[in-house]
UniProtKB/Swiss-Prot annotation:
Assembly and oligomerization: Homodimer.
InterPro entries: Aminoacid_DH-like_N_sf, NAD(P)-bd_dom_sf, THF_DH/CycHdrlase, THF_DH/CycHdrlase_cat_dom, THF_DH/CycHdrlase_NAD-bd_dom
Chain residues that bind NADP(+): G154, R155, S156, S181, I222
Reactions it catalyzes: (6R)-5,10-methylene-5,6,7,8-tetrahydrofolate + NADP(+) = (6R)-5,10-methenyltetrahydrofolate + NADPH; (6R)-5,10-methenyltetrahydrofolate + H2O = (6R)-10-formyltetrahydrofolate + H(+)
UniProt protein name: Bifunctional protein FolD
Pathway the protein contributes to: One-carbon metabolism; tetrahydrofolate interconversion
Family to which this protein belongs: Belongs to the tetrahydrofolate dehydrogenase/cyclohydrolase family.
Pfam families, per database record: THF_DHG_CYH (PF00763), THF_DHG_CYH_C (PF02882)
PANTHER family: C-1-TETRAHYDROFOLATE SYNTHASE, CYTOPLASMIC (PTHR48099:SF5), C-1-TETRAHYDROFOLATE SYNTHASE, CYTOPLASMIC-RELATED (PTHR48099)
Enzyme Commission number(s): 1.5.1.5, 3.5.4.9
Role played: Catalyzes the oxidation of 5,10-methylenetetrahydrofolate to 5,10-methenyltetrahydrofolate and then the hydrolysis of 5,10-methenyltetrahydrofolate to 10-formyltetrahydrofolate.
Gene: folD
Amino acid sequence: MWIDCRTIARSIEERTKERVEKLGFTPKLVSVACTDDPSTLSYLKSQRKKAEKLGIAFEILNVSPEEIVSTLKKLGSDESVNGVFVARPFPPSFDEKEILSSVPVEKDVEGVNPANLGLLLYDEEIFPPCTAEAAVRILERETNLSGKRVTVVGRSVTVGKPLALMLLKKGRDATVTVCHSRTVNLEEITKNSDIVVVAVGRAHFLKKNMVKEGAIVIDVGINYVDGKLQGDVDPSVEEIARVTPVPGGVGQVTTALLFEHVVRAAERQRK
């Protein structure tokens, strides 16, 4: 069975639009890019369309790699800007941690600044990473997480690690296992899990024989195979489990949450 993520995304967007109307001013998101990567530029265009739909002002700043840190710092002091998004990939020679640390903490709507990530250790989710939060929102709609055995396959800073912390949070209380490329007996671990979240960047990585019947599977994968978008989960898994589709799954909820965070940032700054 496919999980209906579009309905979740629409619900988030409807609430976001209502909150925008109550603000009394137009919140603004600035996306900073130092890349000509076609998929990144396409995503930024989709951000613009979504912002217009929600009543949020939007601007794209194309800067040179050398200017990105100083640009992010300037946006931190610009009172007309409520949210800052920094587009990836970055040039290989540049320090990703330095760049992400320059995103203003109070405007870090994607939850990439190490300071915001660190708050997850204390169960504080002011601006959690959008993709990790999307996985949590979907799971909370599908099941009660307390005591559930959850396996997160992938240990990235943007998804795997923060998601594990969010699932462990008091009140959610999942029992979490994090697997990665060095994990032994991965199939045995996933097969004994109530929930499997896959974020490894390998098309159709999770096979039907790796999942128990009735499990929930969250597919965070974005892979292009012969020009078509494919997830990390093999389509056959849907025959025995509840699975988020790709496209139209986690990504839809992730984008909706990005703009929810813009409004949250605006509300906090107004105070």
